[in-house]
Design a protein with these regions (language model features):
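An alpha-helical interface "stripe"
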Residues: 1-202
């Protein structure tokens, strides 16, 4: 439902429904179908979030970015404040195929659209970031639509963070996302706590 809150904040939305569709659900179905079609054709989610897309001659905006001059653009600032970030734990992302009933440790969504996934490991239980990377490489099908849609995937443990923007099975390439070559120790917290603090601050 979060995916469409921002649509309802746009003046064109009700006009679009009235002029071109039977009801709001009919319009939403076409929006979802259009997003899926564009992703399947290789369009990047970031491009869709930034630019939206045209539907029946009207631009559909899926997200709003912070305007540079809020005093000069009240409408843009209002829409920006209607963005909704949500975090889902142990999210099942597929009901069929290779990924059936698989769960992601964390998924972050913007207006209902998945943008970030995280696989988390605890070194105290014998699992490390290496296990998280292996999980992405061997237990996450790279052609799964939801996974392909996401902008970035993080593998992390108590001390290290690795990231990739494209899953490719065994060929998935991960890059470090640490503060330094080795994350510094943090008194009373884990060395990777910056991931959570940075996210909360954003």
């Amino acid at each position: 439902r979060y995916a469409f809150t921002i649509l309802r904040e746009q003046p064109m939305w009700q006009k679009l429904i009235t002029q071109s569709f039977a009801d709001e659900q009919d319009a939403l179905n076409i929006v979802i179908e259009t997003i899926n079609t564009k992703i399947n054709r290789g369009e990047n989610l970031l491009s869709l979030l930034k630019n939206g897309f045209m539907l029946q001659g009207r631009r559909i905006r899926l997200a709003a970015f912070k305007p540079k001059m809020t005093l000069d653009d009240d409408d843009a600032d209002h829409l920006y404040k209607k963005n909704i970030f949500s975090v889902v734990r142990q999210m099942k992302y597929s009901t069929q195929g290779f990924d059936k009933d698989n769960e992601l440790d964390l998924c972050i969504l913007l207006n209902g659209l998945p943008i970030i996934t995280l696989e988390l490991k605890n070194e105290a239980t014998g699992q490390t970031v290496v296990n998280a990377m292996h999980q992405y490489q061997t237990n996450r099908h790279p052609q799964n639509r939801m996974l392909r849609t996401c902008l970035v995937h993080f593998a992390m443990d108590n001390n290290r963070v690795m990231m990739t923007t494209q899953l490719a099975g065994d060929n998935t390439r991960f890059l470090p996302f640490n503060k330094e070559t080795v994350n510094p120790q943090v008194e009373g917290d884990y060395p990777t706590c910056y991931m959570w603090k940075r996210g909360a601050a954003s």
